[in-house]
Amino acid sequence: ERVAGVTLATSPVVVSGGRGVGSAEAFAPLEELAGLLNGVVGCSRAVTNNGWRNHTDQVGQTGTRIAPDVYIACGISGAIQHWVGAMASKNILAINTDAQANIVTKAGYAVIGDLHAVVPAISAEIRRRHNK
């Protein structure tokens, strides 16, 4: 659920998912994490092409260019078209099983692992620290 008036282009935190998320339903943990961080959810073109999310959520050259304080890229390969839309982000955390993925090599921070385990663990730790 987005904070009123906050858009993909203006949010200080964006949690995006790519093909690695696997399905529309599998975006639920990303939605939860974005909510805990008062951010919004974005996605890659592969996700909109698969019909998992609306084009309005797409980050990239043919979507929205973003410049959040924190960009968390989950299961995104980091094709140049996506990178063009995300590269102005101040801090990028890539979560991916592929240590050689473009987004991983360009991100300031990376967790090499399964987003389906990592994202819920991050959310659980945030809830623990903030009693949410």
Question: Where are the regions that the model predicts?
Answer:
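N-terminal glycine-rich FAD/FM-binding segment characteristic of electron-transfer flavoproteins
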Residues: E1-K132
